[in-house]
């Protein structure tokens, strides 16, 4: 068995290479290994200009580089000064002076990031024109669709903060091109370069940072089970021990010197590839083609040791047909798989290539993955050619260089087949037991038999209706022992002693606490099955082997628990776009409370309400099942969604989708349809209804950069006024302000021939002038005011006495102008804030200016110590830590004079295998998939709810 030697996977500093062609590289300057399954750097190691070790890795070719501390330093005490050589007209296609940043090994996963920022200083008296480039593993091999470019001009003598938006091309922003297919999970290179013809230029770079993307998508890395020792060998091709064939085809190798050596660890081949040849290689070929088909899902692995003192770019080609140079068809693209890997100086380890490329194709449909084995090895990255090979007919394979600038030396210790450690598909098999729980670990209160659920159910039913409001509470949960205000028979708001407050129907001060999503809808998970006829459940087939393999049990159609099957007609993201779903939570309710699902659900409804009362919550949060509305024990909030055929507007960065165009006359009809549906669920005279949320987390934009801030207006103005009501409204506003197009041109610094041209399209996507930003801000406020005023008008027609709670703003989806436009029309401003507490995230500086009561619609904390693989948007170390964080967060809400409550998202844990809609599998519930409460969190909530009115009003 081959020993796995030392191989450093995650080195602290990134690899900064200033070579035109990698030392052993090719014209397209490919870089370090990056295939999915290779070493993943989720946060992204980025240049550390304070590290001496980092600067030692700088190479010089067609430019000079030096560390400086007296100019261009914007963070810390050091920066990198780069003098780019001039490029003549004759050489403009021959070389591109550049600075490159690579992961030391593996790849960067920047999927949760939206941009990369850095400061660029131009210390000269001439403008500097440079280009930023980001590439994934395919991009570094030359695919323009996988290379994102951004051209930047830095004025003479200035320092410019530059932000490279990863969706800049998609948003059609000026200066961006390429990158339409870039894989942000698999980034392997960032570079700054100049394009000739160009005079010599000098810039100073510093302060690299990654900026989070908008949206609440948080991808968690799969937990890894560290495996020490060698990687298992499926089959040995050769280990070069005495008596074993080397399979070296010297007649097909080029510029290669091969020496067989014997060591205490066994035999090896010492290989030297000479730079005298454009493609020096060592080729391996057996007398007859290798047949590896019997080994199933495997990788071809090389145990290599680099003898170079600089990075070594090594290419690997595997052919399943005879080489065309010998009369066959394999040419490096056809009947060939071509790949590459970068060996750092002194690297000594296992490098592997899945010949079927199956590892990168596994889609589990879970936001966080189950544990997988983690070996000390590096993937060889797929580059081009066939995506999979005929493993029954492997004719040859070779290791080679492309256009090297110097000789390369490395040792080959063995060639073998190993398991496909990237895929590790076995980790999905038998993942979930009959209760929907992870089979691979244990935790307190994990269910092992039906009798446990039955006993818990009996105890819960025995305590039914024995709960009552906490002492000092009104029947609505208000502060009965507090000051008496005017009771109107409905919830309202009032500022009391400088603090905004809700007031219950009897006139008591009221603070809203509660839990969102008390419903069954999000408890289903994709089973992997689909049907020819979904309505009849006929023609059943396995549509996803990976999904189906996860479950050790699913009920037969004649099982009473089969009531928990359903069908998802459309899935936002996951292993399938549609298919059968199953609710383990629903099945567990039947096991726990007995009878049919309908009978068990009735018991669950009563027990859930009793829990809310016992735990001291004053409201049911957003998206409670309407069947809970008439409970007469806990107040509730209702919700509505606006759909319809009205026009939409895109920000260019829409998380959930484009926003409504409220200037479209059809929008009013869409709002009326929403209120009509809402009134089928609520009673307009119900005093228990605190208010109504309409929509949620609209993509209004944010202030992270101008593109996000003003994107709605930028896109709206690009539309044809005849097709966009918003464009028409904005145009009329601007005409009233400027009257003559020349006045607008002067103010904005643009050149528009006429208002007619402006009406057809004003597609300006470069930098915005000061006056443009001012006018765009006005139009954002107009847009917001129109949306919220329209919704309010229609909502108050049917519910004149209930609070309009707005459309909760995500911290990534609100700007000051949008909030200002909403404030006059909502009764309560609402925000979703996933953070440690109110003060740790978000800009609350405008609360006093808005002077509105405010509520948090969503927050949570999760852990991975109860069988789920994801800790949610904000994670905690344990169940006890979740409880601690809950208390800290709620205290920060109670301390703020503008906030009148907060709702936790959500009541039930996500399914372990991911909710059907988008694979979310978070431990963020107050109860588990078996309907078992998390005691530490429950106790923390009870304690806060007991003290809330004293905390809020007695300080």
Swiss-Prot record:
Hydrolyzes agarose to yield predominantly neoagarotetraose and neoagarohexaose. It comes from the Bacteria. Its EC number is 3.2.1.81. Keywords: Glycosidase, Hydrolase. It catalyses: Hydrolysis of (1->4)-beta-D-galactosidic linkages in agarose, giving the tetramer as the predominant product. Signal peptide: none annotated. The gene is agaB. It comes from Vibrio sp. (strain JT0107). It is an enzyme of class 3 (hydrolase). Belongs to the glycosyl hydrolase 50 family. One of its GO terms (biological process) is carbohydrate metabolic process. GO terms for molecular function: beta-agarase activity; beta-galactosidase activity. This is Beta-agarase B. GO terms for cellular component: beta-galactosidase complex. InterPro entries: Agarase_CBM, Glyco_hydro_42_N, Glycoside_hydrolase_SF.
């Amino acid at each position: 068995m081959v020993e796995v030697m030392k191989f450093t996977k995650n080195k602290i500093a990134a690899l900064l290479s200033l070579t035109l062609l990698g030392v052993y590289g090719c014209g397209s300057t490919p870089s370090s290994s990056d295939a999915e399954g290779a070493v993943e750097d989720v946060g992204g190691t980025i240049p550390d200009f304070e590290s001496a070790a980092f600067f030692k890795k700088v190479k010089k070719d067609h430019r000079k580089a030096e560390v400086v501390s007296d100019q261009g330093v914007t963070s810390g005490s050091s920066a990198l000064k780069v003098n780019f050589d001039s490029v003549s007209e004759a050489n403009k296609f021959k070389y591109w002076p550049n600075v490159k940043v690579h992961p030391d090994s593996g790849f960067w996963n920047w999927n949760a990031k939206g941009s990369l920022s850095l400061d660029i200083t131009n210390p000269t008296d001439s403008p500097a024109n440079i280009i930023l480039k980001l590439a994934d593993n395919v991009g570094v091999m030359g695919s323009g669709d996988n290379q994102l470019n951004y051209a930047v001009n830095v004025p003479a003598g200035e320092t410019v903060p530059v932000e490279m938006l990863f969706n800049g091309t998609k948003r059609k922003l000026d200066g961006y091109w390429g990158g339409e297919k870039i894989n942000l999970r698999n980034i392997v290179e960032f570079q700054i370069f100049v394009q000739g013809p160009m005079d010599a230029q000098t810039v100073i770079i510093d302060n690299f940072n990654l900026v989070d993307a908008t949206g609440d998508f948080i991808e968690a890395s799969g937990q890894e089970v560290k495996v020490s020792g060698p990687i298992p060998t499926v089959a040995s091709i050769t280990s070069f021990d005495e008596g074993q064939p080397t399979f070296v085809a010297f007649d097909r190798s080029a510029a290669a010197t091969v020496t067989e050596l014997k060591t205490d660890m066994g035999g090896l081949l010492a290989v030297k590839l000479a730079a005298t040849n454009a493609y020096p290689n060592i080729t391996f070929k057996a007398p007859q083609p290798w047949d590896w088909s019997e080994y199933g899902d495997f990788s071809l692995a090389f145990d290599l040791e680099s003898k170079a003192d600089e990075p070594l770019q090594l290419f690997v080609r595997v052919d399943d047909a005879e080489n065309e140079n010998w009369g066959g068809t394999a040419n490096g693209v056809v009947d060939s798989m071509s790949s590459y890997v970068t060996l750092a100086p002194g690297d000594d380890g296992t490098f592997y290539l899945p010949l079927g490329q199956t590892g990168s194709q596994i889609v589990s449909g879970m936001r966080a993955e189950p544990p997988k084995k983690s070996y000390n090895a590096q993937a060889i990255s797929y580059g081009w050619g066939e995506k999979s090979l005929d493993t029954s007919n492997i004719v040859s394979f070779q290791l080679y260089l492309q256009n090297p600038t110097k000789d390369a030396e490395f040792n080959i210790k063995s060639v073998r087949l190993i398991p496909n450690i990237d895929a590790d598909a076995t980790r999905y098999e038998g993942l979930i037991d009959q209760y929907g729980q992870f089979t691979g670990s244990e935790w307190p209160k994990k269910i092992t038999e039906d009798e446990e659920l039955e006993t818990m159910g009996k105890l819960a039913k025995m305590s039914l209706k024995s709960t009552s409001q906490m002492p000092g509470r009104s029947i609505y949960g208000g502060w009965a022992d507090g000051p008496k205000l005017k009771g109107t028979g409905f919830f309202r708001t009032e500022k009391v002693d400088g603090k905004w407050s809700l007031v219950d129907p009897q006139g008591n001060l009221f603070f809203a606490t509660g839990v969102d999503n008390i419903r069954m809808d999000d408890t289903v998970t994709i089973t992997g099955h689909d049907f020819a006829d979904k309505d009849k459940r006929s023609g059943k087939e396995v549509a996803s082997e990976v999904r189906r393999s996860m479950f050790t049990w699913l009920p037969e159609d004649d099982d009473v628990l089969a009531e928990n099957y359903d069908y998802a007609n459309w899935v936002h993201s996951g292993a399938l776009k549609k298919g059968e779903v199953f609710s383990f939570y629903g099945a567990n309710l039947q096991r726990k409370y007995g009878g049919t699902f309908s009978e068990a659900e009735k018991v669950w409804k009563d027990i859930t309400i009793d829990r809310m009362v016992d735990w001291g919550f004053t409201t049911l949060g957003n998206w409670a099942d309407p069947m809970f509305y008439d409970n007469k024990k806990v107040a509730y909030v209702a919700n509505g969604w606006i759909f319809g055929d009205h026009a939409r507007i895109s920000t260019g960065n829409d998380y959930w989708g484009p926003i409504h165009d409220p200037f479209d006359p059809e929008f009013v009809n869409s709002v009326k349809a929403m209120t009509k549906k809402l009134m089928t669920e609520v009673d307009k005279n119900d005093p228990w209804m605190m208010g109504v949320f309409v929509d949620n987390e609209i993509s209004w934009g944010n202030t992270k950069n101008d593109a996000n801030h003003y994107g709605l207006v930028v896109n709206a103005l690009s539309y044809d006024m005849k097709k966009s009501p918003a464009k028409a409204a904005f145009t009329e506003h601007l005409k009233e302000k400027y009257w003559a197009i020349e006045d607008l041109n002067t103010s904005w610094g643009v050149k528009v021939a006429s208002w007619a041209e402006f009406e057809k399209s004003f597609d300006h996507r470069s930098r915005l002038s000061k006056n443009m930003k001012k006018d765009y801000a006005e139009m954002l406020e107009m847009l917001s005011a129109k949306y919220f005023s329209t919704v309010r008008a229609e909502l108050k027609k049917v519910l004149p006495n209930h609070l309009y709670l707005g459309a909760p703003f995500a911290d990534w989806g609100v700007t000051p102008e949008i909030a200002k436009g909403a404030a006059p029309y909502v009764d309560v401003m609402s925000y979703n804030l996933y953070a440690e507490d109110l003060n740790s995230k978000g800009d609350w500086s405008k609360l006093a200016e808005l002077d509105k009561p405010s509520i948090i619609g969503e927050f949570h904390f999760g852990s991975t110590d109860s069988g789920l693989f994801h800790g949610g948007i904000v994670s905690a170390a344990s169940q006890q830590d979740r409880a601690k964080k809950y208390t800290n967060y709620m205290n920060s809400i109670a301390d703020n004079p503008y906030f009148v409550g907060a709702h936790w998202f959500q009541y039930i844990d996500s399914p372990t295998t991911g909710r059907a809609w988008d694979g979310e599998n978070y431990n963020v519930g107050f109860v588990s998939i078996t309907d078992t409460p998390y005691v530490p969190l429950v106790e923390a909530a009870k304690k806060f709810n007991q003290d809330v009115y004293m905390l809020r009003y007695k300080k």
